Amino acid sequence: KAGYALSGFLFRLLLVFDRRHHTRSVQHLLHAGIAKDKAQARRLTVASYLEFSKLLVEIVKMDQLYDPAKIRVVGSQAAIDISLSQEHDNKPVIIATAHYGNWEVAGTAYAEKSRIPMTSFMRPFSNPLIGKMILDHRAGDMHKLVDKREGIRPILRAISQNRITTMLIDQHAGANEGITCEFFGHPACVHMTPALLHLK
């Protein structure tokens, strides 16, 4: 609780001084139609920043608080049976997911629950100090992290080793990395990599 309080205070300060991201968040919420007006968009922006502050604390404290026995996988029983099976018909599994919940801890938790090693592909953090702090606490023997700038070879290597391959695909892709489709009623460039790997 003390960690949440301290990080919440620091992130509120960040929100005050980081006007560029504050303004961009409000604009995106309004553009997507999630917020009905600027006042609601600002409230959602503050709430989002505070959730990020909690996530950072949870990652830093993961070594002390993480308990595999408390992890459970939810969803349809058929999906659970398939996802937690070690067989998978000898086919590699590709997970395309988004930034929701504590996605940093979720990769490790899922790999340990399924007992199948996972490789997650990520883009580098804009702040290298925060990035190092997060990476030092979230990677383990069952969960390997790979910088997406390394290209396609690490992905193919992970697939050939029957590791679970995970990609976060809810961020705007570059013009040479994605294809345009509708997202929240607006055109967005989405990543093609998971679909191309599946077809391969």
Annotate each PLM feature.
Residues I59-K61, A139-H143, T166-Q171, A188:
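Short, structured secondary-structure boundary patches
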Residues A39-Q40, F121, K148, H191:
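Residue-level detector of family-conserved "landmark" positions at structurally sensitive sites
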Residues Q86, A111, R138, A158, ...:
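A generic structural signal for well-ordered alpha-helical segments
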Residues K1-T97, N102, G131-D136, M142:
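Membrane-anchoring hydrophobic helices of lipid-metabolizing enzymes
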Residues D89-R149, H172-F184:
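Catalytic core of membrane glycerolipid acyltransferases/transacylases, capturing the structured
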Residues P117, E150-K200:
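Membrane-associated lipid acylation/remodeling enzymes share a hydrophobic transmembrane-juxtamembrane segment
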Residues R24, V105, M133, R153, ...:
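Short Gly/charged-rich anion-binding patches and loops
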Residues T23-R24, P124-P128, P187-H191:
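Active-site metal-coordination segments of metallo-dependent hydrolases
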